[in-house]
Regions:
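Non-globular, low-confidence helical/coil segments that flank catalytic cores
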Residues: 3, 19-271
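Bacterial N-terminal signal peptides
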Residues: 8-16
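Bacterial N-terminal signal peptides that target proteins for export
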Residues: 1-8
Length: 271
């Protein structure tokens, strides 16, 4: 009888453990060097990819998806069309089915943009949403909400394409994540004016460059965890790292490898 009770207790513990694990949201920040690629796995199982790194990074993502059993992407968000964000998107489209793509409403003359658009044309089942100026859309996957906002302007001047970056706010229970693409001063100011941007986890804008990341923006976000997509050849500015550390943020860099952050809806932790 005692043995039977122990077996039942163990089975119940395993069941409750699996149930708790199934309710976790996972966000993986991939080490792409000075390039962006993040994979969100919803508690209900949907897969959301934000950016796809460079062309080389796209190949790494395809290999990683095959290894980890990621057989489809429910939503792919391309924040803007710089080669270190869209460069690997064609490889993703060629390697797994992608149900939906959200991208900003401008075009770019580049090889990477052309390859991405060509790959999209070869994926007729992929629904494409273009967010033009002031556009906004929200997706819900089970208990998570993902709100995506477009830039407010149609012209930020010469060489200011980064300010067209889509921003993505992810909410699960009491926890919040903010993904900022390469938002520079003008776009960060828009986000500040739009309302509360406090978050538990922040993907630091524009690879942590001090000249392009405002202290006011970081202070308003006040994240518990931050990830910077930088590289040994082009590291984040120490001023940005120090600003974050001084507010108690646990700062992580792509130079240290992948980062996996988990939320149970009440708190976040590094896994």
């Amino acid at each position: 009888m005692k043995k039977l009770f122990s077996m039942i207790a163990a089975a119940l513990l395993a069941l409750f453990g699996l149930s708790a694990q199934a309710q976790e949201l996972t966000v993986r920040f991939f080490d792409m060097g000075k390039a962006d690629a993040m994979l969100i796995t919803a508690p209900s199982g949907e897969q959301i990819l934000i950016d796809a790194g460079t062309n080389k990074g796209g190949k790494k993502l395809a290999e990683r998806f095959a290894k980890d059993g990621v057989n489809a992407i429910d939503l792919m968000i391309i924040t803007h069309f710089d080669k270190d964000h869209v460069g690997g998107a064609d490889k993703v489209l060629e390697s797994v089915p992608v149900a939906r793509v959200v991208m900003p409403g401008y075009a770019k003359e580049s090889k990477q943009y052309t390859q991405f658009m060509d790959a999209l044309s070869q994926s007729p089942k992929t629904q494409v949403d273009v967010l033009s100026a002031k556009g906004e859309t929200t997706f819900e996957f089970g208990d998570i909400a993902l709100r995506i906002t477009a830039a407010q302007e149609t012209d930020y001047g010469i060489d200011e394409e980064n300010d067209f970056s889509l921003a993505a706010y992810l909410t699960y229970g009491e926890t919040k994540f903010l993904f900022t693409g390469d938002a520079e001063d003008a776009r960060q100011t828009e986000l500040l004016r739009a309302g509360d941007i406090a978050c538990d986890v922040l993907k630091v804008p524009y690879h942590g460059r001090a000249v392009d990341v405002s202290a006011a923006f970081l202070s308003a976000c006040h994240p518990k965890i931050a990830f910077i997509t930088d590289s040994d050849d082009d590291p984040a500015d120490p001023i940005v790292v120090k600003l974050l550390e001084n507010m108690g943020t646990d700062v992580h860099s792509a130079r240290d490898g992948d980062l996996c952050v988990v939320s149970d809806g009440k708190s976040v932790r590094v896994k």
